């Protein structure tokens, strides 16, 4: 019941994805060959959310791995859990998208998209009751952003009533991997605004900061960053996979977190995070993790929640705890920091409790917040986009693949609209209701 098909597009998506499958397999007691080695029935009870049972009791991830070049696939296959995936579910081209959104979305990616949709269809058909798709990709490259958004829009057509959830790695403010990131990101956001139900925005720089400051790792690798992301992805879906006192699923998350259809870009956080040395000095109680969860240093985006206000938030607790305590803490947070929460949505924190904590922890909490400060990120990318687009720098790479300049202008204005929508709701108060009634008619 309630299965999720996980799609990984591009190098970034596949690296996060393969780390994520290590975490999930570990939680369910599945070893790298797909054999169940666990010790508790709870691990098996709803293992089928992410795994399909093949002949001989072998568990196969419901994963679709896509890339436009074979390199990443080879490294996934060579990784610790490389043999667990179905070989047919690796779909790759030979040419690569070369960090070009147009190649991923219109030329190279479009040639591959039919075979990808076939595999997705097969996976969806083997499900009892498909809950939705989760897509891991980055917005700065070519494949994850271009082909990822193409796939999202195709899946949207075919499964209009299923939840479409994306884990999107957004370019960082200071560190840039690619010069054309602003173009690729803006074009992708333009698609995500229309086609996804919930987008978790994750930012490499914020992840580096968490590794440096909180976990005290001197030289964090992408593996460490991806592990952090996996912890969150696993936390978001743990209610589907393990029994709990207060359950939540992808649809409940969307219903409770998205006040207006376009504002579905969330911030993520995870607690407890502490360095190996300081673990024994920290408390592990509901108030402790609640406090750490709302800490700006724990957010996986380079946007400061203090600069915006929470439209809605969701706290997904894991571990044995009393519901009363959780409710008290949530109320407490809202009362103490009421200025950071929008007052025209009362009780805007949703909480859920799952009984099984992650490996090695007594208690953990995953935080998903819809904060207006995420506009900082879009605004930053928009400024970089405008600076390059005004001079038409690098544009020939995109027009050469058949794109039109109009698309860039549309994407830019769509992103600017998004920023101003966030700003409008950040400034809105209860009193001004009369003014908005006329505007809301569109």
UniProtKB/Swiss-Prot annotation:
Disulfide bonds: none annotated. This is Tubulin beta chain. It is found in: Cytoplasm, Cytoskeleton. The lineage of its organism: Eukaryota, Discoba, Euglenozoa, Kinetoplastea, Metakinetoplastina. Keywords: Cytoplasm, Cytoskeleton, GTP-binding, Magnesium, Metal-binding, Microtubule, Nucleotide-binding. It comes from Trypanosoma cruzi. It holds the Pfam family Tubulin_C. Mg(2+) binds at residue 69. Dimer of alpha and beta chains. A typical microtubule is a hollow water-filled tube with an outer diameter of 25 nm and an inner diameter of 15 nM. Alpha-beta heterodimers associate head-to-tail to form protofilaments running lengthwise along the microtubule wall with the beta-tubulin subunit facing the microtubule plus end conferring a structural polarity. Microtubules usually have 13 protofilaments but different protofilament numbers can be found in some organisms and specialized cells. Transmembrane segments: none annotated.
